[in-house]
C-alpha cells in the first residue's frame, strides 16, 4: 500500500490490479460500517454510503476500461471476485454482477486455474516450485465463484435450473481447511480434518451446500423448460441428501442446542464460526423449503405429501429464526446481514410461504402464532430500512406488485381448473410489466401493505398460490427489479 501511494505521489501510474484491490477493500469497509466506527471516524452513515458508491464505481471503472485492460493475475482476480460479491449484496443480481462474474471466469481460464490440480499441473509445481500462498488463494477464488454459481442455480429467479461451471470441466482441489497463518510459500500438508474448526470452516460449509444445489438442478426438471413438477420420489431423494448433509456437518456447525452449547468456547475464540453456522443453515433451509414448496399446499389435504408441507413450513420458520440470530453473531465480526440482498430475498420468500399456511388454515389452533411469525418477517424487513433503504424499498415494491396482482384476482372465484393458474400468472406478470413500464405504484407504508396482503390472501386457491410463489421467483427478483 505504501508503495502504491508513493508511486501516485510522484505523479506516476500505479499497478492497476493493486489499486483495484485497495479500492474494493475500502468499499467493503464502507459497506460494513457500524455506529461505533462512524463515531470513531467522526463521519455519518450518508458519508459511508457515498464512500462505498465512490470506491466501488472506481473499481468497476478499472474493470470496464477496455482501452487499458487489467492483466490477468491473482491480485486482479481477487479484486474482481470481491467486487462481484459487494455489488451483489448492495445492488442485487443486476447486469454488472453477471459481467463481473464472467470476467472472473475468463480470467481464471486465462490463468488455467480450472486445471490447477491436474496431475500435469501438480508435477510442474513439484519440479519448478511455486508460491503455495498464491495457489491457495486461487483455489479459494475458484470455489467461491463456483459455489455462487451453483447456489444461484437453485435460488429462484431467472437463473433457476442452470449453472455455468461444469464439474467435468475442472480439476481444482478444495481449499485447505486451515488458518491463514499456517499457509506459507513453501507449506505442504496443511489441510486439517473437517472436525477441526478453522477460518475456512464456514467457506467449506458453503461449498458443500452449493454442491448439493448443483445435484438438485441436475435431478429436477428446470422450471424454465418444463411445466411439470418433479416426481415426488425425486424430491424425497433430494431431501435425503439434505438430511445427510445436516448429519455430516462438524459438531461445531450443528444447530442443535447441545452442540451450540458445546461450541461456546470455540465461538468465543473464533466468533466467525457462529456466523458461519447460522448463515450456512439459513442457506440450507431456504433451499430445503424451495425443494418442497411445489407440494406443500397439496400436503395440507393429501397425506401422501404431508411431509412436504411439514418440512416447507418448518424450514421457512427456521429461516426467520436464523435471520433473527444473524444480527448478534454478525455484530461480533462486523457483518451487517440487513445490508445483504440475498439474505433479505430469502426472508421475503419465507414470509410468503408462511402466509400461504396462514391463508389456508385461518382457524387452526396455532393460526395466531403462525401469523405472528409472518409479521415478524415484516418487522425484520422494516428494521432493515434504517441501514439499507434502497434494498427494503425494492422488497416493498415487490410486495406491492404482488398486492396489485392479488387485488385483480380477488374478484375471481377460485376454480379447480388449470385456468386459475393461468389467471394468476397473467395477473402478476401484468403487474410486473406495468411496473417495469413505469406505471408507478402508490406509496404505501409497511403496516398497510402487510395488513392488506394478509386480508386478500385467503381468497386464493392452491393453484393460484403456487403460481404466485413461482412468479415471485421468476419475476419478483428479476435483475431489472432487484
Positions of the model-derived regions?
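Amphipathic alpha-helical protein-interaction segments enriched in hydrophobic
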Residues: 73-81, 203-210, 261, 273-293, ...
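Eukaryote-biased recognition of C-terminal alpha-helical segments
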Residues: 361, 376-429
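C-terminal transcriptional activation/regulatory domains of eukaryotic transcription factors
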Residues: 1-75, 80-93, 127-133, 191-197, ...
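Classical protein tyrosine phosphatase
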Residues: 91-107
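Residue position in alpha-helical solenoids
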Residues: 62-65, 107, 148, 245-248, ...
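Fungal transcription factor middle regulatory core
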Residues: 2, 10, 34-39, 109, ...
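Intrinsically disordered, low-complexity transcriptional activation domains
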Residues: 230, 339, 387, 419-482
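Acidic, Ser/Thr-rich low-complexity linear motifs
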Residues: 116-136, 326-343, 363-364, 384-396
Amino acid at each position: 500500500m505504501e508503495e502504491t501511494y508513493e508511486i501516485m505521489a510522484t505523479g506516476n501510474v500505479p499497478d492497476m490490479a493493486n489499486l483495484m484491490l485497495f479500492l474494493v477493500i475500502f468499499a467493503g469497509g464502507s459497506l460494513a460500517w457500524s455506529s461505533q466506527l462512524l463515531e470513531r471516524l467522526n463521519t455519518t452513515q450518508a458519508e459511508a454510503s457515498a464512500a462505498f458508491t465512490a470506491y466501488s464505481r472506481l473499481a468497476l471503472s478499472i474493470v470496464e476500461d477496455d482501452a487499458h485492460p487489467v492483466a490477468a493475475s491473482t491480485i486482479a482476480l481477487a479484486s474482481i471476485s470481491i467486487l462481484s460479491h459487494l455489488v451483489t449484496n448492495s445492488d442485487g443480481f443486476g447486469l454488472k454482477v453477471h459481467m463481473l462474474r464472467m470476467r472472473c471466469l475468463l480470467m481464471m481460464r486465462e490463468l488455467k486455474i480450472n486445471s490447477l490440480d491436474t496431475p500435469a499441473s501438480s508435477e510442474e509445481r513439484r519440479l519448478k516450485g511455486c508460491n503455495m500462498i498464491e495457489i491457495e488463494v486461487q483455489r479459494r477464488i475458484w470455489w467461491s465463484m463456483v459455489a455462487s454459481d451453483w447456489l444461484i442455480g437453485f435460488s429462484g429467479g431467472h437463473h433457476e435450473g442452470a449453472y455455468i461451471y461444469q464439474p467435468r470441466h475442472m480439476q481444482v482441489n478444495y481449499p485447505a481447511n486451515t488458518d491463514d497463518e499456517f499457509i506459507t510459500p513453501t507449506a505442504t500438508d496443511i489441510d486439517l480434518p473437517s472436525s477441526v474448526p478453522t477460518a475456512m470452516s464456514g467457506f467449506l460449509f458453503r461449498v458443500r451446500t452449493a454442491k448439493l444445489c448443483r445435484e438438485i438442478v441436475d435431478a429436477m426438471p428446470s422450471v424454465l423448460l418444463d411445466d411439470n413438477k418433479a416426481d415426488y420420489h425425486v424430491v424425497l431423494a433430494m431431501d435425503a441428501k439434505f438430511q445427510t448433509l445436516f448429519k455430516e456437518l462438524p459438531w461445531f456447525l450443528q444447530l442443535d442446542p447441545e452442540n451450540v452449547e458445546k461450541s461456546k468456547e470455540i465461538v468465543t475464540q473464533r466468533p466467525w464460526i457462529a456466523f458461519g453456522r447460522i448463515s450456512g443453515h439459513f442457506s440450507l433451509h431456504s433451499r430445503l423449503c424451495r425443494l418442497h414448496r411445489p407440494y406443500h399446499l397439496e400436503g395440507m389435504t393429501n397425506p401422501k405429501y404431508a411431509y412436504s408441507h411439514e418440512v416447507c413450513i418448518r424450514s421457512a420458520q427456521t429461516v426467520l429464526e436464523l435471520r433473527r440470530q444473524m444480527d448478534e453473531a454478525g455484530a461480533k465480526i462486523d457483518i451487517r446481514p440487513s445490508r445483504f440482498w440475498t439474505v433479505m430475498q430469502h426472508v421475503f420468500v419465507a414470509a410468503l410461504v408462511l402466509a400461504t399456511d396462514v391463508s389456508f388454515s385461518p382457524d387452526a389452533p396455532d393460526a395466531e402464532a403462525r401469523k405472528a411469525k409472518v409479521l415478524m418477517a415484516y418487522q425484520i424487513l422494516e428494521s432493515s430500512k434504517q441501514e439499507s433503504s434502497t434494498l427494503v424499498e425494492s422488497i416493498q415494491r415487490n410486495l406491492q406488485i404482488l398486492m396489485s396482482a392479488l387485488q385483480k384476482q380477488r374478484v375471481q372465484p377460485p376454480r379447480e381448473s388449470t385456468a386459475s393458474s393461468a389467471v394468476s400468472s397473467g395477473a402478476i406478470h401484468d403487474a410486473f410489466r406495468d411496473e417495469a413500464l413505469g406505471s408507478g405504484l402508490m406509496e404505501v407504508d409497511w403496516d398497510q401493505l402487510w395488513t392488506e396482503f394478509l386480508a386478500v390472501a385467503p381468497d386464493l386457491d392452491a393453484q393460484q398460490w403456487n403460481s404466485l410463489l413461482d412468479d415471485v421467483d421468476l419475476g419478483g427478483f428479476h435483475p431489472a427489479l432487484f
